[in-house]
């Protein structure tokens, strides 16, 4: 099955990045979008990480009755492409009313759900992109992860980031 032409154009429009974004850059990106598109966006702190970092959520309005989509980057803090992807999607949705109309959703975008973990990986985000440099600056938590740590018999306390994703807001 071939992708629709509009989607191929969206994919082709994704630019190159010489480095991955850290916590501060992702936060700055969300704040810039909220300031640039106040008529369709709301930026809200939906929680705080274990180490005191804000968990910011950018809401991009849709039409009344549209379903809500939740997008969050960095459920694994050593996979920083998710933050850039979430930020790119937010920028495209803000800039293009046609895209918003085509996708017909209200969007909630958290560019970085694990800022504590991403901070521990920031040593390799700008390179050099060698195995040695990556290994020396690599971090991945050993405990519960945002993406799968819901209520289960194996977890006693759900991480803050998971609770913030699950919380419903009107």
Q: Across the structure, where does each feature detected by a protein language model lie?
A:
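Short beta-strand-to-loop junctions in surface cap/lid or active-site-entrance loops
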Residues: 57-65
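Active-site-proximal beta-strand/loop segments in catalytic clefts of secreted hydrolases
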Residues: 46, 74, 111-114
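Short glycine- and acidic-rich boundary segments immediately preceding or forming the N-terminal edge
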Residues: 1-56
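Active-site/substrate-binding loop(s) of hydrolase catalytic cores
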Residues: 66-67, 80-84, 88-170
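Hydrophobic side chains in beta-strands
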Residues: 59-60, 71, 111
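Short beta-strand element of the alpha/beta-hydrolase
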Residues: 67-76
């Amino acid at each position: 099955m071939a992708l629709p032409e509009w989607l191929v154009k969206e994919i082709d429009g994704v630019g190159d990045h010489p480095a991955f974004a850290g916590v501060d850059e992702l936060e700055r990106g969300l704040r810039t979008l909220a300031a640039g598109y106040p008529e369709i966006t709301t930026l809200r702190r939906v929680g705080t990480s274990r180490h005191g970092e804000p968990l910011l959520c950018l809401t991009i309005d849709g039409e009344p009755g549209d379903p809500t989509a939740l997008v969050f980057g960095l459920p694994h803090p050593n996979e920083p492409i998710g933050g850039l992807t979430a930020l790119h999607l937010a920028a495209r949705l803000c800039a293009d009313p046609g895209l918003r109309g085509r996708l017909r959703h209200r969007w909630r975008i958290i560019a970085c759900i694990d800022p504590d973990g991403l901070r521990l990986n920031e040593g390799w985000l700008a390179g050099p992109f060698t195995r040695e440099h990556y290994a020396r600056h690599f971090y991945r938590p050993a405990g519960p992860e945002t993406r799968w740590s819901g209520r289960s018999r194996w977890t006693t306390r759900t991480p803050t980031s998971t609770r913030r994703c699950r919380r419903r807001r009107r």
